Amino acid sequence: MLGEKVGAIAVKSIAVAFMLGTAWHVMAQDAKAPYPSMAPLDQYLMEDRSSEIALARSAAPESISRDAEVLVLGRHGYETAIQGKNGFVCIVERSWTAPIDDPGFWNPKGRAPICLNAAAARSYLLRTIKKTDLILAGRTKAQMVEAIAAAIDKKELPAMEPGAMCYMLSKQGYLSDRDGHWHPHLMFFVSQADPAAWGAGLPGSPVFAFNDTWEHLTTFLVPVRVWSDGTPDR
């Protein structure tokens, strides 16, 4: 039964290409896209800082998030709201960390709570912060991609550390207009791996992979059965 549910989830995930925090191939911006350009910055910010902290923490079980560092988005980028004790970092990603060809790339409603372990905080998170800094500085999608790719090539942004992963278990997130909070899942970040080595995407496998060649990144996704508050995914 779980296998059937996971399989259905996987098909849906691939169809909507929902994955925030992973960039893909650059494509020309569709004039008919629902969000053709960046909205005013205020629409991406959360007025209540405590609400953003709570949303970020909802990405992982309380046993993890209560001692995690928490970042919130300000007008000039992410800021540390709470110092952590356990190496985890919780953050609410915005729409510009979605796939470059995602029609919701500029969706001001996008809120993706994610809680990264220490290895991911030292590697993957740096890319999210850099992308955000570039966007808030007025860069276009294409300019952001060019700058990130150059920083990776120059090793200004590090490769993924072994064991880099994150929790995305929040029922309060908003990943897309179509799917809202989608389903609870874990993600594992690897520098350009072969998905077949994980058995990703094979019939009956609960593991799925997204390859991002320009960013030299492979993200493995594993759906799970419960949200961070312990309630089942239905």
Q: What are these regions, as identified by a protein language model?
A:
Residues 1-9:
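N-terminal secretory signal peptides that target proteins for export/translocation
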Residues 30-234:
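Primary mode marks residue(s) on the alpha4-beta5-alpha5 output face of response regulator receiver
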